[in-house]
């Protein structure tokens, strides 16, 4: 599933072109994704202006004129791409990026040039909703999201407060979107390795009123920030279906220290990386370095 760095990379790829653009036409190649498209979706969008493209956690927010917002979630395999006429003809001629195109939006940018914005989703777990912009953060999907890991408020102290009395694993708490918005399995594994913390460790141990606990919490918060920022700078991680808005791949997967490296040597101590299952998800860690 695309995590915060992948979604932010998409946002940054689309934003310069679509901000201020007018929606010319909409084509729906099916009636639904994970959920049905909003009623009269095409008719309600044509003629609108895309005022701003935002992100909250793993959600993209296309803020439109007339105070409505398209909330887009990429699901497991969704991707957005943007093409001009020449690039679109090249892709079509090559038969590339045509299958599983479910939503197509033609827009006219502020400079008058026409672009084609396409949503592709092999597994169709993504979805789009059309919401009232003024009340969007009251929607159940957004209302309970935690802090953004790159926000000024995110810190070791915040983590300590969030971990109080949490008897479950550190990995489980870090994946809780009501605590940290947008953080997923890949980047939790990477941040924990950098912090030398086991994914099986009880989260409450970082909330203890000791110097050691505070230092671990500060280190973890900083490493989460660093991993997320680095992944964004590399254009995210491509494991299976994720692509950037120009059709290219992300590159952060080449910088993984533990994720997907079961049996390979730990870069720190040399012993094999271990994979375990936690709540149905794979955790990768070094049993020697991470305690």
From Swiss-Prot:
Catalytic activity: Hydrolysis of DNA containing ring-opened 7-methylguanine residues, releasing 2,6-diamino-4-hydroxy-5-(N-methyl)formamidopyrimidine; 2'-deoxyribonucleotide-(2'-deoxyribose 5'-phosphate)-2'-deoxyribonucleotide-DNA = a 3'-end 2'-deoxyribonucleotide-(2,3-dehydro-2,3-deoxyribose 5'-phosphate)-DNA + a 5'-end 5'-phospho-2'-deoxyribonucleoside-DNA + H(+)
Disulfide bonds: none
Binding site for DNA: 100, 123, 166
SUPFAM superfamilies per UniProt: Glucocorticoid receptor-like (DNA-binding domain), N-terminal domain of MutM-like DNA repair proteins, S13-like H2TH domain
Cofactor: Zn(2+)
InterPro entries: DNA_glyclase/AP_lyase_DNA-bd, DNA_glyclase_Znf_dom_DNA_BS, Formamido-pyr_DNA_Glyclase, FPG_cat, MutM-like_N-ter, Ribosomal_uS13-like_H2TH, Znf_DNA_glyclase/AP_lyase, Znf_FPG/IleRS
Gene Ontology BP terms: base-excision repair
Enzyme Commission code(s) on record: 3.2.2.23, 4.2.99.18
Active site (record annotation): 2 (schiff-base intermediate with dna), 3 (proton donor), 58 (proton donor), 281 (proton donor)
CDD domains named among the record's database cross-references: EcFpg-like_N
One MF annotation (Gene Ontology) recorded for this entry: 8-oxo-7,8-dihydroguanine DNA N-glycosylase activity
PANTHER family given in the database record: FORMAMIDOPYRIMIDINE-DNA GLYCOSYLASE
Annotated function: Involved in base excision repair of DNA damaged by oxidation or by mutagenic agents. Acts as a DNA glycosylase that recognizes and removes damaged bases. Has a preference for oxidized purines, such as 7,8-dihydro-8-oxoguanine (8-oxoG). Has AP (apurinic/apyrimidinic) lyase activity and introduces nicks in the DNA strand. Cleaves the DNA backbone by beta-delta elimination to generate a single-strand break at the site of the removed base with both 3'- and 5'-phosphates.
HAMAP family assigned: Fapy_DNA_glycosyl
Family: Belongs to the FPG family.
Protein name according to UniProt: Formamidopyrimidine-DNA glycosylase
Gene: mutM
């Amino acid at each position: 599933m695309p995590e915060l760095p992948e979604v932010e990379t998409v946002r940054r790829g689309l934003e310069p072109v679509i901000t201020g653009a007018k929606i010319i036409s909409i084509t729906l190649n099916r009636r639904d994704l994970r959920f049905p498209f909003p009623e009269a979706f095409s008719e309600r969008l044509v003629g609108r202006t895309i005022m701003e493209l935002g992100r909250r956690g793993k959600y993209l927010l296309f803020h439109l004129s007339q105070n409505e917002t398209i909330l887009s979630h990429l699901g497991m395999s969704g991707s957005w791409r943007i093409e001009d006429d020449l690039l679109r003809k090249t892709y079509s001629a090559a038969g590339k990026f045509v299958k599983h195109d479910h939503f197509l939006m033609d827009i006219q940018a502020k400079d008058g040039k026409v672009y084609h914005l396409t949503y592709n989703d092999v597994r169709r777990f993504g979805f789009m909703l059309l919401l009232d912009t003024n009340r969007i953060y009251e929607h159940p999907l957004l209302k309970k999201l935690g802090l953004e890991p790159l926000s000024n408020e995110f810190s070791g102290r915040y983590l300590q407060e969030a971990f109080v009395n949490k008897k479950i694993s550190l990995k489980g708490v870090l994946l809780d979107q009501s605590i940290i918005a947008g953080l997923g399995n890949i980047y939790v594994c990477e941040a924990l390795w950098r912090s030398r913390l086991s994914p099986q460790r009880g989260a409450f141990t970082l909330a203890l009123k000791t110097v050691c606990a505070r230092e671990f919490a500060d280190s973890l918060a900083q490493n989460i920030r660093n991993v997320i920022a680095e992944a964004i700078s590399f254009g995210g991680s491509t494991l299976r279906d994720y692509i950037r808005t120009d059709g290219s791949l992300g590159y952060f997967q080449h910088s993984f220290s533990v994720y997907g490296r079961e049996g390979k040597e730990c870069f720190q101590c040399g012993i094999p990386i271990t994979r375990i299952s936690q709540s149905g998800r794979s955790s990768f860690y070094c049993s020697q370095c991470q305690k």
